[in-house]
Amino acid sequence: MSDDLFERRQAERRYALKFLDYEILSSKGEVTGRGLARTLNVSESGLRLETGQFFEPEQTLRITLGFDNDLVQINGCVINSQPESDDLCSSGVMFLEFDEADRRTYQKHFTALKSALEE
């Protein structure tokens, strides 16, 4: 990782632009909103996304990512959200919950991305 004293990330990031679908979940697990976003970077434990929606810290999202012919669904918690322009915000999301099959699929694609970027 970085020697930067202000860097708080625990996992190394890989830069990959993918589109994703998200649902905003209430504290009761009910869907209160939905939209599309794109990933700015991904790691084993989270991702940074860009969208027109500003999220509050600790907001729970259900994210669906598409990898080739695979769909992966992840529940995550917004760690931070900041405006990037008048129309766009970026948000850091920490993964909370994976189905085991989705975890394996995500890990397979993340490992392939990591290998491709290291070459």
Where are these regions (language model features)?
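Short, surface-exposed secondary-structure edge patches
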Residues: 11, 50-54
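N-terminal helix initiation/capping motif
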Residues: 1-42, 107-119
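Hydrophobic core residues within well-ordered beta-strands of beta-rich domains
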Residues: 16, 35, 61, 72-74, ...
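Short beta-strand-centered aromatic/proline hotspots
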Residues: 74-80
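Short, conserved beta-turn/loop elements at beta-strand boundaries and strand-helix junctions
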Residues: 25, 44, 81-86
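Short conserved beta-strand and strand-loop elements enriched in small hydrophobics
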Residues: 19-26, 59-71
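Short, solvent-exposed secondary-structure boundary/capping segments
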Residues: 47-51, 84-95
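Short solvent-exposed strand/turn elements
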Residues: 15, 21, 55-57, 89-108
